[in-house]
């Protein structure tokens, strides 16, 4: 395979020497780059190999903006990273490619991708039950889907940063949009088309959409994927003079006065008279004892990525909505038994999904079931403790894994003491996406708008942008 890759360019060569089998390193001008692969990077990881080569030649396209690159260079080293992957995992390449890019930027970083299927002895010894699993100098720091910004934040927390290399600055805009999903992208485009100076500050472009496998209800687009839609959102925004500032997380807001201040943990501050909050929502946690302790060791959120680790085993799916029942149907094809646990007295999933799940012989469904505890033996999950809400009876179900599928929670924490929110944490808006604070607007899943749908979020983002522009023209902000 490597010889085939090298045959594409006279600037690439392959040298075979002594060492571990199925392991190779990438060198540039005869010098080690810190990027290595233990396994054959085909399947979804073939792009990781190609992108690593392109990045080292200065032609890659997955580097973040200079401010984020500066954060990478400010990491205190040395840092030795190892990522265990499955070649069928759709989330693994994002993590591998992000860490390879960081390694390219920092001379004291190294990163090894390991195919867990080939090195099963290591997977067992490390008790890995979810991928991608990232180890930093032997310590597990990340499991599951992740993007450049999330991984960088974890490395900063683990190793610290050289403060002399960090950025302290204030950047001024007419409109700052928080979030890069359908609502945020729409708001940014509509604002830019009004001739305003616009910034999109987001953890990742696409938001929650990126985790959706198939999309068939975006009118005029019969079928697409979350990843494809996310990339199209980025491409559309790039058609306008919009500052796309990805891999940022706002930790402090100051909303008094005409100009609002939004600050990141790394010292960047954004200032604008209008802020459109389109931060979306994220997976809810059970918030029961044992859940956090066993994430990646039996507690999972993505059946597509982590399902293969439970082949022939008994798993539970907590949640009876569409995502939960879809997960149960998918897992039933590889697991010996799937137990669905729903808190309410009936399933919330579409009837067609319920009928399909009930037709499967290895799927059992329990409603009125409250999850009390994730039970483990110190190494991995061995069971789940539940209570029948009607009888009060408690029981322990012995199993091997738990997939949590209980919906989404609004990403509004940093604003909850600043603007009005409802009990679930959604930002309360009027029919024009205005909040109770002048100059602050909200759109999409983070707001109280009913029906959390992509197409609705796009419309809400446009509405928020038009409301902000109208208020600007009228002198309200």
Regions found by a protein language model. Give the residues of each.
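Non-catalytic, surface beta->alpha helical segment in thiol-disulfide oxidoreductase systems
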Residues: 27-60, 135-163
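Structural micro-motif
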Residues: 16-35, 123-137
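Rossmann-like nucleotide/phosphate-binding core characteristic of flavoprotein oxidoreductases
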Residues: 7, 104, 108-110, 114, ...
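Thiol-based oxidoreductase modules, predominantly thioredoxin-like and allied folds used
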Residues: 10-19, 107-121
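Beta1-alpha1 glycine-rich phosphate/pyrophosphate-binding loop at the start
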Residues: 79-87, 91-93, 97-99, 104, ...
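FAD-site-proximal beta/loop scaffold in flavoenzymes
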Residues: 282, 287, 292-309, 398, ...
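A Rossmann-like FAD-binding core segment of flavoenzymes
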Residues: 230-272, 277, 332-431, 470-477
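Glycine-rich dinucleotide-binding loop and its adjacent helix/turn
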Residues: 160, 166-172, 281-334, 428-431
């Amino acid at each position: 395979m490597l010889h085939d890759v090298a045959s594409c360019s006279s600037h690439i060569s392959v040298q075979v020497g002594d060492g571990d089998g199925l392991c190779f390193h990438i060198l540039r001008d005869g010098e080690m780059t810190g990027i290595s692969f233990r396994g054959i990077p085909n399947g979804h990881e073939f792009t990781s190999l190609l992108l690593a080569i392109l990045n080292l030649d200065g032609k890659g396209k997955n580097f973040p903006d200079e401010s984020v690159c500066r954060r990478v260079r400010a990491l205190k080293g040395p840092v030795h990273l190892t990522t265990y992957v499955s070649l069928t995992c759709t989330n693994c390449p994002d993590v591998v490619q992000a860490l390879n890019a960081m390694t390219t930027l920092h001379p004291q970083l190294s990163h090894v991708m390991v195919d867990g299927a080939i090195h099963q002895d290591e997977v067992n010894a490390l008790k890995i039950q979810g991928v991608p699993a990232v180890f930093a100098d032997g310590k597990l720091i990340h499991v599951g889907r992740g993007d450049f910004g999330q991984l960088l934040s974890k490395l900063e927390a683990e190793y610290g940063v050289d403060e002399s290399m960090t950025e302290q600055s204030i950047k001024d805009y007419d409109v700052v949009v928080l979030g890069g999903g359908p609502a945020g992208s729409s708001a940014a485009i509509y604002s830019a088309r009004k001739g305003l100076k616009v910034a999109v500050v987001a953890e990742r472009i696409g938001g929650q959409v990126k985790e959706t496998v198939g999309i068939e209800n975006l009118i005029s687009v019969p079928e697409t994927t979350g990843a494809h839609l996310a990339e199209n959102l980025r491409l559309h925004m790039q058609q306008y003079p919009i500052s796309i500032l990805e891999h940022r997380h706002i930790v402090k807001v100051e909303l008094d006065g005409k100009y609002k201040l939004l600050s990141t943990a790394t010292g960047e501050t954004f200032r604008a008279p209008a802020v459109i909050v389109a931060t979306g929502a994220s997976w809810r946690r059970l918030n029961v004892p044992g859940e956090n302790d066993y994430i990646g060791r039996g507690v999972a959120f993505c059946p597509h990525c982590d399902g293969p680790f439970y082949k022939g085993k008994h798993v539970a799916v907590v949640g009876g909505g569409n995502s939960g029942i879809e997960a149960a149907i998918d897992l039933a094809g590889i697991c010996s038994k799937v137990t669905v646990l729903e808190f309410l007295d009936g399933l919330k999933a579409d009837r067609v999904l319920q009928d399909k799940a009930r037709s499967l012989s290895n799927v059992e469904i329990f409603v009125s079931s409250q999850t009390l505890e994730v039970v483990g033996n110190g190494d991995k999950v061995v069971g789940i403790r539940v209570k029948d809400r009607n009888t009060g009876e408690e029981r322990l179900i012995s199993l091997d894994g738990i997939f949590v599928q209980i919906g989404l929670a609004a990403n509004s924490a940093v604003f909850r003491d600043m603007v009005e929110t409802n009990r679930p944490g959604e930002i309360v808006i009027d029919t024009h996406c205005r909040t109770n604070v002048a100059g602050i607007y909200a759109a999409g899943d983070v707001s109280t708008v009913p029906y959390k749908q992509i197409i609705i979020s796009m419309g809400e983002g446009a509405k928020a942008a038009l409301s902000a522009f109208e208020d600007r023209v009228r002198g309200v902000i």
